[in-house]
């Protein structure tokens, strides 16, 4: 019999592989070119924040990924972000019920997200779109999960640091917060 941790590792691998395989064949488009050429200095980020989008977290993520990584690497990082978001969704109910996360719930949530998201490509594979929606929702999912862990009594220094960092990233992300 395969134990739950191995099943969860397989579920994580399946989600990551499916997302990466689609992202692998998705070309750069639209704002990806503009954000790849943006200046990534404090003054450049501030000017863009005040004059254009107001999304400091997502704009910095998209510019950093496009500027410093090859398409295959930023696609892998982006696939990991979606996988982490879905993993957080699967762990949240387990933490609330003090049970083990289910790999079947993770796979179900991934396919539900895939089917129910009418703009799946724009919010997950187009890199600037994923920075605006996927990454920011990932930070929100991490914040919710860490909040539950802290409220359940896990107040280690690392947990409190992640709690503060995730609250800032989630709070400064976009209109979802």
Language-model segments: what does each one mean?
Residues 62-65, 77-89, 136-139:
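Transmembrane alpha-helices of multi-pass, membrane-embedded glycan-processing enzymes
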Residues 48-79:
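Short hydrophobic/aromatic helix or loop-helix immediately within or flanking a transmembrane segment
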Residues 55, 103-148, 174:
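Membrane-interface micro-motifs in multi-pass membrane enzymes
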Residues 21-40, 49-61:
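Extracytoplasmic catalytic/substrate-binding loops of multi-pass membrane glycan-assembly enzymes
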Residues 80-104, 142:
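Transmembrane-helix motifs of polytopic, lipid-linked glycan transferases
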Residues 159-177:
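Membrane-interface alpha helices of multi-pass inner-membrane proteins
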Residues 4-30:
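Transmembrane signal-anchor helices characteristic of membrane glycosylation enzymes that use polyprenol
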Residues 2-3, 91-102, 150-157:
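Membrane-interface helix-boundary motifs at transmembrane edges
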């Amino acid at each position: 019999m395969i134990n739950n941790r191995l099943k969860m590792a397989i579920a994580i691998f399946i989600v990551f592989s499916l997302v990466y395989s689609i992202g692998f064949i998705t070309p750069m488009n639209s704002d990806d070119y503009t954000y790849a050429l943006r200046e990534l200095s404090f003054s450049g980020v501030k000017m863009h924040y005040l004059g254009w989008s107001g999304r400091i977290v997502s704009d910095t993520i998209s510019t950093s990924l496009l500027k410093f990584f090859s398409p295959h690497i930023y696609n892998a990082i982006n696939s990991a972000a979606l996988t982490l978001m879905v993993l957080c969704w699967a762990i949240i109910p387990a933490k609330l019920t003090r049970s083990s996360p289910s790999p079947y719930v993770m796979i179900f949530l991934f396919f539900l997200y895939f089917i129910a998201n009418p703009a799946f490509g724009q919010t997950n594979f187009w890199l600037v779109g994923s920075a605006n929606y996927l990454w920011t929702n990932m930070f929100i999912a991490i914040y919710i999960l860490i909040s539950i862990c802290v409220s359940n009594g896990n107040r280690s220094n690392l947990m409190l640091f992640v709690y503060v960092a995730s609250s800032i990233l989630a709070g400064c992300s976009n209109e979802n917060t």
